[in-house]
From Swiss-Prot:
Bias (Low complexity): 842-858, 893-904, 950-979
Phosphoserine modification, residue list: S508, S835
Compositionally biased spans, kind Polar residues: 1-11, 859-878, 918-949, 980-996
Provenance organism: Drosophila persimilis (Fruit fly)
A matching Pfam family: DUF5917
This protein's name: FHIP family protein GL19323
Keyword terms: Phosphoprotein
UniProt KW Metal-binding keyword: no
Length: 1067
């Protein structure tokens, strides 16, 4: 019931009504009543006054002539006094006492006793029906009276016919009527209170189910209401009256939706209500059509105020009224699916898919016209994808998430074209904003931990195992190579970054120290590095390195412990979600049962192949004959890329593995190898020897120990005879393509890109690990492998940034700018506009704007970063990791706990400054929270668009806190990323995904490539102008710093994944 908790109605109501406004607290038009003077009043005097006022009102009611204005005003005035006296009496009684059977006992509430015994409410209703044009005024006073009695008497009065009968009459007469706003407000408040009472007393539900025919026939005889238009025999009057207000704005709409949700929750307890709502009410079509109408009112183009904007944040929602209404309707639908009866839930999901998702959302995302041509309006595509991303981050109910996943994979509704394929194509868009929004959307999709999505994006291309050579497949489940991969990633750090760390790290005790007076001498350098004259001490990290090589300042830069903690937490979360999958998608050993028959069948296939190509069955032949025949089989065309057929020694036989996937959706078209005992959809992809022979593709076999070759130990499959390489699918091809242009991309695209790959590495799937984390496994895809791309990037950066003094200075400035940006985003997240850093940057901001205009709008990602005063550097660090008396020392465990706590509103952690710093630089779809790391998350986000004149950074969070290495967790989004295992939000909500981008951008120009200005660009021009090197060199320096931090993160993930494998094997 998250909808009920977040309703504004809860803020205005008092504590006694369960969050629902009471009559006296929520009715501003009600006169001020002497509630506090109740104890000073004589109960007998109150009773006499009450009777007198009613007698005077009743004298007016008994007039046969049509009531005049004075008559109505007199009755309303007397009723107002009667309400006052009733309120005084009810406050005087701690508990309402109903009429007692003991005649000698004085009633505890004599006024209320008189009201019920004399049937005053029924008489008042009968007279109100004759008031003509004054009916609304009298009805308003009646509703006030009922509201007061229901709020104070709770459920006791509903059991008495003198109260219930006129209440049902006035509610029935309100159906189909159009009332003024004040009357609508009273009616909705009364209905809300009735729903609360019924929720607490389910046995009273049947009182509000009545036969429409019998009830209305009686009212028709009295001349009260017209006959019903529909032929239904039952009616839940409260629910029917609330339906017209479901899409209303403001507090009236919130109260109506609250009451409707209570009715939906009641349907779980009473099947009659569920049947009525599903079969006889129009709530589901009304919700869906209203949602489609509200979506059509959304802006076709979103104003982008920051160069790194990539997704819609909660603050953006509140700033766009149309988007606020749409999100209210969407969240209400999500809440209905969460609490309603199964019949209502299924009906709403069907209407949502057929009435909103496919006809409304589909064309908007595809951006198609009548001629089925794509629009060239990039802004429309950006806004549509941003809305889709917001929807996926907002809904948390698994059933609703499944409907959206089905929408992405549906091929029948859009003429054979899948939405998911169109989204993948946009990853290659040359437009930076569209590319970032697309990657943010894919970060949200990956954060769902949905098996179907992962199967379509990655696994169906990897399941055949053709990307891994046969001789390497037995390594997939081994543990040791993961540890080696950690070293591999750390070794790929650019040389200039390694040199900078060596210079910044304090010398150990055993190192030789130079003489204190020899200031002009060169310091002792490692043998691997050339000696440099007078190296510049790093300004950004020199003061914050301790003797353990860990960064211990307020920034989380180079904090390996934070990377390890984050990797452990994210991998564990992903593993829990993936446990719900139908298949494990892991390499497994040959099944013991029926193994002999499987081997015999494979041997028979091999003999068929040799018979067709060699004229005989040479499965077991002499060594000479085998060499002569096999050596003559040369490859037709290029080599397949696979290593030679390799026999497995006896000691490795137990490690021989094969991919056995018990799924019907993976390789149905590829698995031609079937047995009576088992069906193997192997890593080879099936295929018989005859089929392979028809391809006529050659293969080679090692002639070493050929007599000892055991065909049954081979991963026999058609890919052994396949020519060329295989594709890893359009998604990975697009990601690898972006990664190959890493040094040419903008900083923000790289942040999203690295975060997206990091999210993939969190999955507990050895198949994905073979691509990302296993440097010892060769990949035979049609594009360079991930590790090859990383090596190429290292070579590019080393070539453009050699280890020189100028390069070290540029690296230091890049690092200082990114860390300063990190601090600024943290301050913005905390709403700390009065921080010393903020005040210090104000004059520099004005100056940098003038310089920026004079320098002709330099378009560089480096130029968008602020370069405020760097951290003061010292030659050595006095930091003691075991010092407990330092008040400024922050507890990582405490910080992490506070960051992981769920909050309904953006609540920046006050005590976790160090642990939440990297969050400021959240990666948009990747959820990466460090300016240098690419950690991704699905639920936390920041809005990074700011006004440069105000200098205030608006950092927004969706309700999930940030982790130690800067990642944010979803709930929810929460947005709950959901989450996210189809648990919305799953839990990642996620609130979540995190936007890792800062407040960056240059001033706006009229050109096509111009980008909006933001806070980062206005504070960096001074130090950039004084920095040596070209613009390209500075951009490469930013890429080098980002790549260095990302490699540390990948090393941490590889190490933690190995720990997970060890734990799984031990268990």
């Amino acid at each position: 019931m998250s909808w009920l908790r977040s309703s504004p109605l809860r803020q205005s109501g008092n504590g006694g009504g369960g969050g629902v406004s009471t009559g006296h607290s929520s009715t501003g038009s009600l006169r001020q009543r002497p509630i506090d003077a109740a104890t000073d009043c004589d109960p007998r005097a109150c009773y006499d006054s009450f009777c007198k006022h009613w007698q005077q009102a009743y004298d007016i009611i008994q007039h046969y002539a049509p009531p005049t204005h004075d008559d109505v005003l007199g009755v309303v005035s007397h009723l107002d006094y009667m309400v006052t006296l009733l309120l005084v009496e009810l406050h005087h009684c701690n508990k309402v006492s109903l009429p007692s059977t003991d005649a000698s006992a004085a009633p505890a509430a004599p006024c209320l006793e008189y009201l019920l015994s004399e049937n005053l409410l029924d008489k008042l209703y009968e007279w109100a029906c004759t008031t003509g044009r004054y009916a609304n005024a009298v009805r308003l006073e009646q509703l006030k009276l009922y509201e007061l009695l229901v709020s104070h008497s709770r459920h006791q009065l509903l059991c008495h016919e003198p109260f219930l009968r006129p209440l049902l009459k006035i509610l029935a007469s309100s159906q189909g009527e159009i009332f003024p706003p004040d009357l609508e407000k009273r009616l909705v408040i009364l209905l809300n209170q009735l729903c609360v009472v019924l929720m607490q007393n389910v046995h009273l539900l049947d009182l509000f189910f009545f036969s429409a025919q019998t009830q209305v026939q009686e009212q028709i005889q009295n001349g009260n209401v017209p006959p019903p238009k529909s032929g239904t025999t039952t009616n839940f009057i409260i629910f029917s009256l609330l339906i017209p207000y479901v899409h209303r704005e403001g507090s009236l709409g919130h109260q109506a939706r609250d009451a409707l949700l209570l009715c939906m929750a009641l349907s779980q307890k009473n099947s009659n209500i569920g049947t009525y709502i599903a079969q006889y009410s129009s709530i589901c079509p009304l919700l869906v059509t209203g949602l489609g109408g509200l979506y059509s009112r959304l802006p076709n183009s979103i104003e982008i105020s920051s160069i790194d904007w990539h997704r819609i944040t909660p603050d953006d929602v509140t700033e766009i009224p149309e988007l606020t209404l749409f999100m209210n309707a969407l969240e209400f639908c999500n809440a209905v699916v969460q609490v309603a009866h199964e019949m209502i839930k299924q009906q709403l999901l069907d209407f949502m898919y057929q009435g909103f998702i496919v006809p409304v959302l589909g064309p908007a995302v595809l951006q198609t016209l009548k001629g089925k041509h794509f629009q060239t309006n990039i802004d429309s595509q950006i806004s549509a994808m941003s809305y889709l991303d917001l929807i996926l981050r907002s809904i948390t109910e698994p059933g609703l998430l499944r409907a959206f996943v089905k929408f992405l994979l549906d091929t029948e509704k859009f003429d054979g074209e899948r939405i998911l394929d169109s989204l993948v194509e946009r990853l290659n868009s040359p437009d930076a904003n569209l590319c970032m929004v697309t990657m943010a959307l894919f970060d949200t999709l990956l954060g769902l931990h949905c098996e179907d999505l992962m199967l379509e994006l990655l696994l169906k291309f990897m399941l055949p195992g053709k990307h891994v050579p046969i001789s390497h497949r037995h390594k997939i489940n081994k543990i040791d190579p993961y540890l080696n991969s950690s070293d591999f990633f750390l070794e790929l750090s650019p040389d200039v970054l390694k040199r900078a760390r060596d210079l910044a790290r304090p010398k150990s005790v055993h190192e030789q120290q130079p003489p204190s007076g020899a200031t002009g001498e060169q310091p002792i350098q490692p043998l691997a590095w050339p000696s440099l004259p007078s190296p510049v001490m790093s300004k950004t990290i020199g003061a914050n390195w301790n003797y353990y090589g860990l960064h211990t300042g307020d920034s989380l830069y180079a904090n390996l412990q934070a990377y390890l903690f984050e990797a452990h937490w994210r991998i564990a979360q992903c593993q829990r979600d993936c446990l719900k999958w139908a298949n494990s998608y892991r390499y497994q050993k040959w099944p013991r049962h029926g193994q002999a028959r499987v081997h015999a069948h494979a041997l028979e296939l091999a003999r068929q192949f040799f018979s067709e190509f060699g004229g005989g069955p040479p499965a077991i032949a002499s060594e000479s004959a085998g060499e002569k025949q096999l050596d003559s089989l040369q490859s037709i065309g290029e080599s397949s890329g696979y290593e030679s057929f390799k026999w497995r020694p006896a000691d490795e036989e137990s490690d021989a593995t094969d991919l056995t996937v018990t799924t019907t959706t993976t390789t149905a078209s590829e698995a031609d190898l079937e047995h009576n005992s088992s069906s193997i959809s192997s890593g080879m992809g099936g295929g018989g020897g005859a089929a392979a022979g028809r391809r006529g593709e050659a293969w080679r076999i090692s002639h070493t120990n050929r007599n000892e070759l055991l065909l049954t130990d081979l991963d026999f499959s058609e890919d052994l005879f396949a020519q060329g390489t295989v594709s890893l699918g359009p998604f990975l091809n697009a990601i690898w393509g972006k990664l190959q242009t890493f040094t040419s991309n903008s900083l923000y695209v790289n942040l999203h890109l690295t975060g997206l790959i990091t999210r993939l590495a969190w999955y507990p799937l050895p198949l994905i690990h073979s691509l990302l984390l296993r440097s010892d496994i060769a990949i035979t895809s049609d594009t360079p492998s991930f590790h090859q791309v990383l090596r190429i990037l290292k070579q590019q950066i080393d070539a453009e940034l050699p280890v020189t003094e100028d390069s070290l200075e540029i690296i230091d400035v890049a690092r200082s700018s990114l860390i300063d940006r990190e601090f600024r985003l943290v301050n913005a997240r905390k709403g700390n506009e009065n921080s010393p850093l903020h005040h210090h940057q104000q004059p520099q901001t004005t100056l940098s704007q003038q310089q920026q205009q004079q320098q002709g709008q330099q378009r560089s990602a480096y130029a968008t970063l602020s370069a405020a005063t760097p951290v003061q550097a010292t030659q050595t660090s006095a930091y003691d990791p075991f010092k407990r008396s330092d008040n400024k020392r922050k507890s990582i465990s405490k910080s992490i706990s506070s960051m992981f706590s769920r909050r309904s509103t953006p609540n920046p952690p006050s005590s976790a400054g160090a642990a939440s710093t990297l969050v400021g630089n959240n990666n948009s779809g990747s959820g990466q929270s460090q300016p240098f790391s690419s950690t991704g998350t699905g639920t936390c986000e920041t809005s990074l668009s700011t006004n440069p004149q105000s200098g205030a950074a608006a950092a927004r969070s969706t309700g999930t806190a940030t982790t130690a290495n800067g990642n944010s967790s979803n709930s929810n989004i929460s947005i709950g990323g959901s989450t996210q295992t189809l648990s919305g939000h799953s839990n990642t909500t996620t609130y979540s995904s995190s936007t890792l981008h800062g407040l960056d951008g240059g001033p706006q120009t009229g050109s096509f490539n111009s980008e909006p200005a933001s806070l980062d660009s206005v504070a960096s021009m001074g130090i950039i102008a004084s920095t040596s090197g070209t613009e390209r060199t500075r951009d490469v320096a930013l890429c080098a710093v980002l790549l260095d931090e990302w490699l540390k993160e990948l090393a941490a993930i590889a190490q933690e994944q190995s720990v997970v494998l060890v734990t799984d094997q031990l268990l």
